[in-house]
């Protein structure tokens, strides 16, 4: 697992102490600027969380009999979204408020890509869909190779 440090100033003594602490509990340390951190976290954390909230909200607004069956027959993907959507709403409200510029940038990129996928489905562009799905599958393989797959459990720190 990683710990990202975004130093406000270049106080080497402070950075050394912080790095030492996080390394002592088995984390790999990365240092990056706050702006870069915000963009990375927007894509890897904040947008997936927002998508989960949106999908679960959409499901909750379906007609009662459909909503009940969505819940009853939840597949793994939907259950993963409900896990995310079950997170602390106050914390996430604050995350989106504090990181709004990076979130809006990445959300714009995501919605453009989603619209492109919607168009491909509408036009039955199976070649584009397969190409897109294959390239995203490669990203998953890289994540697995790096040992970053699966859910985060603090008790797993340092385990592969």
Residue ranges and their predicted role:
Residues 1-83:
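Internal alpha-helical scaffold of NAD(P)-dependent oxidoreductase catalytic cores
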Residues 27-30, 54-57, 109-111, 120-122, ...:
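Glycine-rich loops and low-complexity Gly/Arg-rich segments
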Residues 54, 63-65, 116-117, 127-129, ...:
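Short, intrinsically disordered/low-complexity patches at protein termini
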Residues 67-136:
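Interdomain hinge/lid region at the active-site interface
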Residues 112, 122, 128-160:
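Contiguous C-terminal substrate-recognition/catalytic subdomains in enzyme active sites
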